[in-house]
Amino acid sequence: MKFLIAFVAIAFFACVSAGGYGNIGLGGYGLGNVGYLQNHGGGYGRRPILISKSSNPSAAAAAAAASSGVNSGLYNQRGVIGYELDGGILGGHGGYGGGLGY
């Protein structure tokens, strides 16, 4: 029970530090971008791997803490390619793929 409480507390503080307007990352409101991809490893017998990484280190820590209780695996980033319509400073505000600002 102590470990569960400690895990929840760590995940909560990681999420709080990843959110809010104080952290400056790429894309919307300074939250950073976290992308997920499920890699099946070329067969049905293998456990799928959840891949995730962020432009913001605290957001990556929050994603790792949150996903470790659900599905363990390797973490890495996959970007979404798109174009920007208005060339906003914090990333695209429209266009194909939504523009993650990378």
Curated annotation (Swiss-Prot):
<comment type="function">
    <text>Chorion membrane (egg shell) protein; plays a role in protecting the egg from the environment.</text>
</comment>
<feature type="signal peptide">
    <location>
        <begin position="1"/>
        <end position="18"/>
    </location>
</feature>
<protein>
    <recommendedName>
        <fullName>Chorion protein S15</fullName>
    </recommendedName>
</protein>
<comment type="similarity">
    <text>Belongs to the chorion protein S15/S18 family.</text>
</comment>
<keyword id="KW-0964">Secreted</keyword>
<keyword id="KW-0732">Signal</keyword>
<dbReference type="GO" id="GO:0005576">
    <property type="term" value="C:extracellular region"/>
</dbReference>
